[in-house]
Amino acid sequence: MKTVNVHGFEASSKEEFQVIQSSLVKRIKLISDFKEEDIKLCAGVDLAYWTKGEKQYGVCCIIVIDYNTGEIIEKAYDYGEIEVPYMPGFLAFRELPLVIKTVKKLKNEPDIFMFDGNGYLHYNHMGIATHASFFLNKPTIGVAKSYLKVAGVDFEMPESFEGAFKDIVINEEVYGRVLRTKKDVKPIFVSCGNYIDLETCTKICSKLINNDSRLPITVRLADLETHKRRSELS
């Protein structure tokens, strides 16, 4: 699959990262210009890390499934040294080089990408799901297992039934949604990446839940694959 070269990865400082984020955030579109029934392939993306000596390495895994049957269509992965230091709010700059390399290995072109992480639910609205969207030129969704507290705002827990949700509102703006995908099970944190609205994100996530996990199967399978690959590589 081809990607769009939005920017290089020579930047290494917080100030440079902020400039890039500020230029991209203006291009976020939280609307869906597609119909859910037109989705054929959906991809889950996850990364895992390990340290060897004084160096840190990462592996990115992408699992492509048939949106309607759940059948695994394709798997791809890539790994390498992580050269960008961790800085809160700028995680995408560490992860994107590996994500892009892995996407380029795909023989199939997914209609939707779902990331194990955040999108619009981010200090600068530029979580990995949002930042990656500009390179992928595809709708993206962020699905997080834990809550990223922005501006000191806590989330409100939804009711205990399956499908219950509460929007995450910060400074009168909806950043994402707390979604309970299974009765009496911890919720997940869903946010738009780009080129999609929150209602559609919720429908897609809910459709892709099975008996094995509270996570959509795309994200769950990608998570399992990254742990497997990390064990093999580290």
Curated annotation (Swiss-Prot):
Which residues are listed under the site Interaction with target DNA? Y86
InterPro entries named among the record's database cross-references = Endonuclease-V
Instruction: Kindly give the Pfam families that the UniProt entry links to this protein.
Output: Endonuclease_5
Compartments (UniProt record):
Cytoplasm
Enzyme Commission no: 3.1.21.7
- Where does it mainly reside? cytoplasm
Q: Give binding positions for Mg(2+).
A: D46, D116
Q: Which GO terms describe its biological process?
A: DNA repair
Q: Which cofactor does it need?
A: Mg(2+)
Q: Does the keyword Transmembrane helix apply?
A: no
Q: Which Gene3D superfamilies does the entry link to?
A: archaeoglobus fulgidus dsm 4304 superfamily (3.30.2170.10)
Q: Which GO terms describe its cellular component?
A: cytoplasm
Q: Which UniProt keywords apply?
A: Cytoplasm, DNA damage, DNA repair, Endonuclease, Hydrolase, Magnesium, Metal-binding, Nuclease
What reactions does this protein catalyze?
Endonucleolytic cleavage at apurinic or apyrimidinic sites to products with a 5'-phosphate
Any single GO molecular-function term of the entry would be: magnesium ion binding
Question: Source organism's superkingdom?
Answer: Bacteria
What is the role of this chain?
DNA repair enzyme involved in the repair of deaminated bases. Selectively cleaves double-stranded DNA at the second phosphodiester bond 3' to a deoxyinosine leaving behind the intact lesion on the nicked DNA.
Entry's family note: Belongs to the endonuclease V family.
Question: Per its record, how is this protein called by name?
Answer: Endonuclease V
Q: Which organism is it from?
A: Clostridium acetobutylicum (strain ATCC 824 / DSM 792 / JCM 1419 / IAM 19013 / LMG 5710 / NBRC 13948 / NRRL B-527 / VKM B-1787 / 2291 / W)
